[in-house]
């Protein structure tokens, strides 16, 4: 019974091997995340008499190299939430924080929780790629929002309110009508220096060239508003260059977002649960792949409560003696990215209002009872996850074993 505790960090790790009753098999030692050092660690673990189990914290992405390589070498690996390790064995007044002390603490945790350790399952390459793409998608969405706000801030000094003229959705290449419009009519003087007829003709030709819908009344509305606007920055080459650069940055981020959205949908469609997930209300070609990416393989969850705890939308419990709190906040100790995706799904359900959907009925019921926004949204996310778990697991069980 050998507990291998590994304190993982970037590029290197600290390893300690202990046995019950405080027996030290190997004092803490450092290894690099290289093939030579990892192979040496594998040989060392195999050489120790008795059953060995490796425990490490799943911190960021650093642990994945060791967890993957050790699992492939037929070594039992368990990855633990850092919060559980931090709260374990805090029975000393001294505060010791070092890699060696942490490795030994993780090994003691492994010994104490030996029977309850869950083995790390190798995520197949497709799911790993999908999850990585989703994290990149989230990063570029934040970047796109920042670029959009930056452009609007500049345009407020040259053509205030131009971003509100059109509400058409983004195209498949990420382009938007208001951004393309602002790229051509980047200053209010670009419009009002022309006559109404000249602007209408110019705007119509631009719509035809860009394949946008043209409306004469819209052109007249734009021209009328331009006459009343007061710009701050002058209409010169410096201002034009500033706006053109901001437009290029926004278009670049938007294009990347749409490419990732399409690629994620194509990748998710290769997974077995794709059709049953896409058939659920509130889920489309954007949110569907995000859900699949963040939840991963449903079969690794033993029951419905496990998947809600993984997302951090499970209801909390606060009881002591005769006291029992009725309304307890959720744990929020799970995946923040998954919770964000679930809230987006709930938002879609509220906007589309599918009357025959059980999750929407539940949301509408809680909302009609006067529950606060976050209460009924979180409760709806919990119910959605439970239904997701049941439907997907049942569907996967019905498939031939080869799939």
Q: What is the role of each PLM region?
A:
Residues 1-403:
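A detector of single, family-specific signature residues
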């Amino acid at each position: 019974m050998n507990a291998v505790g590994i304190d993982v960090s970037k590029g290197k790790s600290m390893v300690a091997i202990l046995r019950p009753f405080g027996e030290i098999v190997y004092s803490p030692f450092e290894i690099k995340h290289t093939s030579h050092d990892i192979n040496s660690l594998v040989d060392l673990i195999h050489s120790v008499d008795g059953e060995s189990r490796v425990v490490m914290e799943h911190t960021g992405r650093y642990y994945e190299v060791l967890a993957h390589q050790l699992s492939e070498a037929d070594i039992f690996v368990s990855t633990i939430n850092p919060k559980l390790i931090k709260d374990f064995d805090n029975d000393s007044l001294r505060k010791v924080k070092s890699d060696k002390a942490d490795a030994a603490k993780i090994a003691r945790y492994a010994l104490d929780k030996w029977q309850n350790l869950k083995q790390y399952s190798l995520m197949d390459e497709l799911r790993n790629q999908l999850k990585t793409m989703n994290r990149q998608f989230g990063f570029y969405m934040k970047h796109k929002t920042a670029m959009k706000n930056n452009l609007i801030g500049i345009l407020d000094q040259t053509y205030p309110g131009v971003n509100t003229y059109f509400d058409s959705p983004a195209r498949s290449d990420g382009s938007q009508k208001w951004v393309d419009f602002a790229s051509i009519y980047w200053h209010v003087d670009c419009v009002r220096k022309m006559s109404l007829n000249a602007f209408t003709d110019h705007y119509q030709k631009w719509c035809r060239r860009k394949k946008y819908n043209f409306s004469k009344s819209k052109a007249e509305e734009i021209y009328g508003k331009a006459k009343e606007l007061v710009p701050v920055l002058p209409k010169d080459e410096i201002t034009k260059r500033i706006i053109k650069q901001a437009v290029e940055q926004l278009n670049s981020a938007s294009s990347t977002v749409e490419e990732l959205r399409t690629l994620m949908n194509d990748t998710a469609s290769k997974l077995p649960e794709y059709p049953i997930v896409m058939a659920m209300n509130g889920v489309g070609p954007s949110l569907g792949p995000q859900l699949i990416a963040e939840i991963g393989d449903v079969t690794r969850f033993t029951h419905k409560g496990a998947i809600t705890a993984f997302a951090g939308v499970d209801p909390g419990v606060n009881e002591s003696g005769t006291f029992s709190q009725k309304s307890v906040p959720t744990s929020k100790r799970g995946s923040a990215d998954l919770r964000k995706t679930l809230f987006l799904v709930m938002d879609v359900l509220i906007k589309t209002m599918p009357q025959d959907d059980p999750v929407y009925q539940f949301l509408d019921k809680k909302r009609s009872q006067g529950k606060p926004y976050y209460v009924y949204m979180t409760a709806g996310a919990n119910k959605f996850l439970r239904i997701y778990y049941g439907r997907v697991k049942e569907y996967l069980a019905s498939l031939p074993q080869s799939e």
